[in-house]
Regions:
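Membrane-embedded alpha-helical bundles of multi-pass transporters/translocases
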Residues: 1-176
């Protein structure tokens, strides 16, 4: 995605390349450690009762809001940007734990591999299409009414947030636990 290079050139432009690499690497490591420690607990919670959709919604909301909020983070605000990014990764990763746990609610045992593969592939296809659109926005900002590639990247974060929200709604409304 756009975050690493945009972080360095826009939000952390006042840091040296070494410092910005250190910041993003450290933050990613800390978020990864948090996820590694919390994932087994969250997985057990998902297996314990009918809370999968509630927690999926909560984590998705964290990710959706965080991703969209990146649009509003001002230039040179690297501390805020990296914090919001970390929350977004936690929202995405935590949501995936509960999303994966829902497979037993939406599919018969003999269909779970097919259902999981279909969901996985459609998710990546949709995400890939949006990423392609976002890359085109970056490469040709004028085509999309943007003044600069910077505006295009900022709008890309907002578009990902909206996309995530829109394509999460069918799950929240149509799938029962």
């Amino acid at each position: 995605g756009f975050f690493p290079f945009f972080f360095k050139s826009y939000w952390a432009a006042d840091l040296s390349p070494t410092e910005s690499t250190f910041v993003i690497g450290t933050a990613s490591s800390l978020v990864g450690l948090f996820i590694a420690i919390s994932a087994p607990v969250l997985g057990a919670l998902a297996d314990a009762g009918n809370v999968k959709k509630k927690f999926l919604f909560a984590f998705a909301a964290i990710g959706i809001v965080s991703t969209g909020y990146l649009f509003f983070v001002p230039e040179s605000s690297w501390k805020l940007a990296i914090t919001i990014y970390g929350l977004g990764v936690i929202g995405f990763s935590g949501g995936n734990i509960f999303y994966d746990a829902l497979i037993i609610s939406v599919s018969k045992p003999e269909d779970r591999n097919k259902t999981s593969s279909l969901g996985f592939s459609l998710g990546y296809l949709g995400g890939g299409l949006l990423f392609f659109l976002n890359v085109m926005m970056y490469l040709y900002p004028g085509w999309f009414g943007f003044n600069s590639p910077i505006d295009a990247v900022l709008w890309s974060f907002l578009s990902v947030s909206v996309w995530w929200f829109v394509f999460s709604m069918p799950l929240f409304y149509a799938i029962s636990e």
